Amino acid sequence: GVWFEEEYKRVYPNGSLAADVIGFSRADNEGQYGLEEYYNDVLNGTTGREYGYLNDDANLERTIKPAVDGNTIHSTIDANIQGIVEKYLKQFNEEHKDAVHPGNGAENVGCIIMEVNTGNILAMASYPTYDLNDTRNTDALLGSRKIEMVTNANGYDVLTKTDTYFTQEDIDALTDDELLDNLNYLWKNYCISTTYEPGSTAKPFTVAAALESGAITGNEHYQCNGSLEVGGHTIKCHSYRSGGEGDVSVQDSIAWSCNVALMKIAA
């Protein structure tokens, strides 16, 4: 005889919301990227089975092994805050699209919002992003820089950004491997998978350490002429071209992100 069996799979009712954080599951229900991959064994249940045979009286003898549901996980992401962040990341890119170069307003934009008293992550988003229910939709690549596999000076194959900003014609010309390379770059969580030096985010800690150690009182003022010689190198402030910030208080050094004042504080 013929009978129907239910099939279970994970779906995403909110589409692209928190795509970087959530990740997605493949056709075989294996998680890929994000929470889906990290907690795959927790989220995946056990598939039920039904089998049987016809006995001597031609009656069907059935055996049913019921499915076991996977577990539920709760993240600290606030869907309302996440939605607002994603809205404005997209708005920024639409406003600046094609302004400096063809394509998106920025190659990547990321934003993390944290609850400072607990460390809970309330929102984590980047742009461009994608729909979790349609992960291979190439519309998400439009305006992004093309990624190519190249061999570096050490003989290693590495993914490198080209000077090409995707048009539909560029996407249509990709081989299957090239398309997968570019989709994999899109699917990763930009906020936590791409490394940069901490830069100005370290400045509040420099001032805090100076205050706590007694190296400064907080009432000092520093003169910024736009650059400072340190160890035989000229380190510039963002105000270098305009001749520097001039008189900078400790508070202003953070508010204006003044490199010269911070170097003098750290010294």
Ranges and model annotations:
Residues 3-5, 20-24, 74-76, 110-114, ...:
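Soluble periplasmic/extracytoplasmic beta-strand elements of cell-envelope proteins
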Residues 63-67, 79, 83-198, 233:
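Short pre-catalytic segments that frame enzyme active sites
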Residues 21, 84-88, 118-119, 195-222, ...:
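Active-site SXXK
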Residues 1-70, 87, 94:
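Small/polar-residue-rich segments within soluble enzyme cores
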Residues 10, 18, 23, 189, ...:
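Active-site-proximal helix/loop microenvironment
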Residues 29-33, 67, 75-83, 186, ...:
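Soluble non-cytosolic domains of exported or imported proteins
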Residues 26, 44, 86, 90-94, ...:
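Sec-exported extracytoplasmic/periplasmic mature domains
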Residues 71-72, 117-118, 181-191, 216-219, ...:
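Conserved catalytic neighborhood of penicillin-recognizing serine enzymes
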